[in-house]
UniProtKB/Swiss-Prot annotation:
Taxon lineage: Eukaryota, Fungi, Dikarya, Basidiomycota, Agaricomycotina
Ranges in the topological domain labelled Mitochondrial matrix: 19-34
Comment on protein domains: The CHCH domain contains a conserved twin Cys-X(9)-Cys motif which is required for import and stability of MIA40 in mitochondria.
Location of the transit peptide in the chain: 1-18
Localization: Mitochondrion inner membrane
Alphabetical keyword list: Disulfide bond, Membrane, Mitochondrion, Mitochondrion inner membrane, Oxidoreductase, Protein transport, Redox-active center, Signal-anchor, Transit peptide, Translocation, Transmembrane, Transmembrane helix, Transport
Cysteines paired by S-S bonds: 144-146, 155-188, 165-178
Protein species of origin: Cryptococcus neoformans var. neoformans serotype D (strain B-3501A) (Filobasidiella neoformans)
UniProt name for this protein: Mitochondrial intermembrane space import and assembly protein 40
Database matches in PANTHER family: COILED-COIL-HELIX-COILED-COIL-HELIX DOMAIN CONTAINING 4
Top-level division of the source organism's lineage: Eukaryota
Length: 242
């Protein structure tokens, strides 16, 4: 636009110069040529500048990002961020699965152990308690806790002899023929007070009655004590005679 205006102006000046002078003097012709050359040079320079400006403007326009491209780039960025967040959530979920599984296994194992212990206790409670003597087989269970560990230790043999005699005794009252064995057992207990302490013979006799037959009521304490003492006196009387 600028080059076109400048070219028109230079042509107008040249025409006026030619029309105002009637004769083609050499000096005027030289001046006209110079003016034409100068105008042409200026026009060419203006065209070159204008072309360069358009080139720079086009390159800048091409480099500029359109709104559509900007929106697409933002959408891509959001999609990448979303994918990254989803991956992190999946990773954290996978990392917590083993811990949750371990905790669940521990709870189930504890519940199974508790159920097993409860079943064992119920089975023990449902089983009838057995004494030291089984009247059906006629056997004595020396390991029965009801004997209080008397069958073991330094006086275990004396205890077994007295208890066996009492169990199989058919005398009346029962066990009166085992007084001597009870006396030997009691003397052994007295020799080991650190183990047996003060043992009551009458208490042992009552325990024997209870172990033989739970349905059979033990004799009265006074009556049994009198019979035991009488049996001791009868046993000791021949030894004291001259």
């Amino acid at each position: 636009m600028f080059a076109r205006s400048f070219s028109n102006a230079s042509r107008t000046i040249a025409r006026r110069s030619l029309s105002t002078r009637s004769g083609p003097a050499p000096s005027s012709l030289w001046s006209s040529r110079n003016a034409v050359i100068a105008g042409t040079t200026l026009a060419i320079t203006a065209l070159a500048v204008t072309s360069e400006r358009r080139k720079v403007f086009n390159e800048s326009a091409q480099k500029a990002t359109s709104p559509r491209d900007s929106i697409i780039a933002q959408d891509s960025l959001k999609e990448n961020v979303h994918k990254k967040s989803v991956r992190q959530d999946e990773f954290s979920g996978e990392s917590t699965k083993p811990e949750a599984s371990t905790s669940s296994d521990s709870v189930e194992k504890a519940a199974d152990d508790a159920a097993q212990i409860l079943e064992e206790k119920e089975a023990e409670a449902s089983e009838p308690s057995q004494g030291a003597y089984n009247p059906e087989t006629g056997e004595i269970n020396w390991d029965c806790p009801c004997l209080g560990g008397m069958a073991t230790g330094p006086c275990g043999e004396q205890f077994k002899a007295a208890f066996s005699c009492f169990v199989y005794s058919e005398a009346e009252p029962k066990g009166v023929d085992c007084v001597e064995l009870f006396k030997v057992m009691q003397d052994c207990f007295r020799e080991h007070p650190e183990i047996y302490g003060e043992v009551d013979t009458l208490g042992l006799v009552l325990m024997f009655y209870a172990e033989i037959d739970d349905d059979e009521a033990p004799p009265q304490e006074g009556t049994m004590e009198e019979k035991v003492e009488a049996a001791k006196e009868e046993t000791a009387a021949p030894a004291a005679a001259p």
